[in-house]
Amino acid sequence: MVNPVIFEFIGTSIHNQLNNYVTMVASNTMNMIATTAVLAGGLYYTAMGILMSVGRIEGPFSQLVISCIKFMLIAAFALNISTYSEWVIDTVHNMESGFADAFAGNHGTPSSTIYQTLDNSLGKGWNIAAMLFEKGDNRGLTQIVQGFSELLLSFLVAGSTLILAGPTGAMIVATNAVIAILLGIGPLFILALGWAPTRGFFDRWFGAIVTSILQVALLSAVLSISSAIFSRMVAAINLASATQSTLFSCLSLTAVTIVMPYMMYKVYEYGGILGSSISAATISLGSLAVNTATSGGGAMTSIFSGSSGGGGSGSAKAGGESSYSAGGNAMWSPAYRQHVLGQFNRD
């Protein structure tokens, strides 16, 4: 019996190397951007606070405090390797395994053993090829035609099996490598969430990771289907039967093997399309949330600054804008206060 461990050995070796690579690159990226991020963030929020206090910038002070707290939380994820590994790297790997399990169905193979599944499919086909080769090799001179046919069929089955498992393993290994590279440089893109002009970088980085996860999950689903079909067709080949056409069974197996890689290629392509749409939806939802919050804040400001205070508000308005503002019915505006004080200091 042939029990190959080709893909399992390659996949496990690459997976271990990629895990070390992610940790090393993420740590180096954090060390590179930590000083710049702390200095830039500190200077930015210090300058914004000073400008707001002297009236050069209008806006509620609470918004600046909330923005500063949000930046510190983002920095805690982007500049600490243990937090990043636990909350980001492990989460992405769990998403990959979860999507692969869900898309593969009840009898699907988890993504952690997908390389073993490839080896099992490869071993089943090669076992049939080995039996065909042995049977053809044992033919005598009087059965040279049958022996030659079985030898040819053995090579046909072995090649078809490799064509089925090879591209799938290559695409999964390549996609996992892409995920590892994206996770390695992830701290830079997570830190980009701290400033509005650079938030789009995080959306595109997250979209690329989701695209890779969907591609692995969809490949797992197709692999589960193709492995079931392949195993059933291989089990139907009975070399000892005098009535079954071995040639027809092998040709059917070859036809299925040609169709399945094309299906995997199309599924891989559609995974990229779905991931791109999720990325675009993330950006749109982020913009929608910002616009909604801005509109809601403006509406609440109008409500609290326009009608609170009852009848006293009308008399305050009649007395002038300065007394109305002093009554506590409007938000604190340093620029407006400076303008009012300037009116009193005029000659």
Curated annotation (Swiss-Prot):
Transcription of the operon is maximal in early exponential phase. It holds the Pfam family TrbL. One of its GO terms (biological process) is protein secretion by the type IV secretion system. The VirB system could be required for the establishment of the replication niche in the host. Keywords: Cell inner membrane, Cell membrane, Membrane, Transmembrane, Transmembrane helix, Virulence. Belongs to the TrbL/VirB6 family. Disulfide bonds: none annotated. It is a multi-pass membrane protein. It is found in: Cell inner membrane. InterPro entries: Conjugal_tfr_TrbL/VirB6 (IPR007688). It comes from Brucella suis biovar 1 (strain 1330). GO terms for cellular component: plasma membrane. It comes from the Bacteria. The chain crosses the membrane at residues 32-52, 61-81, 153-173, 177-197, 205-225, 245-265, 270-290. Induction: Specifically induced within macrophages by phagosome acidification. Induced at 37 degrees Celsius in minimal medium, suggesting that nutritional stress is a regulating signal. Its main location: membrane. This is Type IV secretion system protein VirB6.
